[in-house]
Amino acid sequence: MIINEKANDIVTNLEDAERFSINADASMFAILSKKLYSNPIQSVIRELVSNAIDANIAAGVEIPIQVHFPNTLDNIFYVRDSGIGMDENELRNVFTYGGSNKRDSNAQIGGLGVGAKSPFSITESFTVESAKNGVKRTALCFMGPDGRPRFKMIGEENTSESGTKIYFSVADGYANFIRESVPVFLFSVQMPEILNGVETFCNVADVKNIEEFRKLRKLVEKDSHFCRPHMVGPDKNEYIVTKLLNITSQFFSGNIVVMGGVPYDVDISQVWSENYKVSQMFNFDNYSKVAIFHFPIGSLAFQASREKLNYTEDTKKQLQKRYV
């Protein structure tokens, strides 16, 4: 994603002024990892899934990414893509805070240079396997005794595959990973291949299995538009829509925008000075009060955690255009 940071023109005669710098100590890395996300599990799933989808898009492959959920028999969580992979230099760049190879195009979702390191918010170490040009490289990312993250290449072997896999073990709370993946997968650009024999995809909104969840996704995809909101109402499919409404109400306030497959709550009070309600603006009396707005990648600003929108003047203008 192209990051639009505007440079400020300042006229000054202070020629000896020094630039600010960042002290890369343990407290700073804690801010960038363990303290960055309010919902770490959902954020890790979102960031790794988004990166994997980006990798597939860049490689032009239509093979779905793989997501492996932990359980009592196999406690590994992983996300795997079928992209072009990374060599050692590319791995070192991606796993440097602020490092990103996605800032020249809005075809990909990421770009801030923190998402690949998101597992540090819930684990002390994770492993990266990346295959490119016939060589698979394995790197270990771990938190050092000084509280600063470390990166070490630990293996290299020949392979006919390509792509990247990021994985780590989960001690407990397996069901939380399944639950927190719901809002990520509901709007994601690709529906991943879900592994590890998960029979109950989620325990919310009476969605009992993956097939019912896929029906919800089809409804969202069928009615997705990039110009005007669509209002999901019982007149379309009461059985499915009711479940969609139940799901969104558990994770969102009701006003949702989606950019690059990532959903965000909209705080209407941030968009207008008056406290408008979407239900009043759209006369939702005969609908289920769910409006989904789709925006092109790069059109809205978001916070560093990507959990919430950043209500810049440009973002507010974009939102105002859709709400009228």
Features from the language model and the residues they span:
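Glycine-rich ATP-binding loops of the HATPase_c
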Residues: 124-129
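Glycine-rich phosphate-binding loop
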Residues: 105-123
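Short acidic loop-to-helix transition motifs that present clustered carboxylates
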Residues: 27, 72, 112
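Helical mechanochemical/support elements of P-loop NTPase systems and associated helical scaffolds
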Residues: 40-45, 90, 110, 122, ...
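Activation segment of protein kinase catalytic domains, centered on the conserved DFG
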Residues: 27-35, 39
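Conserved ATP-binding N-box helix of the HATPase_c
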Residues: 36-67, 115-120
